[in-house]
Amino acid sequence: ARPEYLMNMEGTRTILNKSYRLPKLIHAKANKLISRIEDRVDKEWTSRDENGQVNIYPVEQLQKMKEGNWLVLARDRYRLDKLEEDLKIYGYFYERGDRTSINKRIHQAILAWEDVRKGKAVDIKAVRSFYNYIVTGRGVSKEFKEMKNVNKEKLYTYDTLVSDYGLSVNKEKPWFDALRNIPLPKATYVRAVLRRKENIKRAPRIKLSTI
């Protein structure tokens, strides 16, 4: 039936003002939603005594964050904790406080390895960052694992590292095959971020902060 037809019918109206099905939290949520409808018959009604539980599934909201820059503000830290968990599940790259969602050391190692295998020369700090995540004895010799007693002012190329500094990982291998010591959950997350075409060389588009 059309709502306006029922609303305009003549007769006696009896309001059922007690719900024996909806708990308190659901009742409050329902009232908040229904209040958005302007042309309606208002009524006062109560819930049952139990509190109940409201679970928010953020998939549709997260879809809106696929593009553009976002600053997400929350009054309570626990709300950001939940959002942060969901952003990680769905592979979003974000920043909270002074840290990004990708571990700093892992982030540096990935970028450094990708630079080296593409022919760029990098400094000793960059070499150490990715050597740390290469399996000793299989991808880099134990002698050079920590790159001690080497020229700290020098720039290093892939060919130089192979010939003189114990590297044996094929440069055709992407970071997730070369840097096998990155913990699997962290590597899986970074790969999910990259599948979203996020640019991890730049600051994250999404920033989380408390008010």
Predicted features, each with a name:
Residues 13, 54-56, 94:
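Generic structural signal for residues in well-ordered beta-strands
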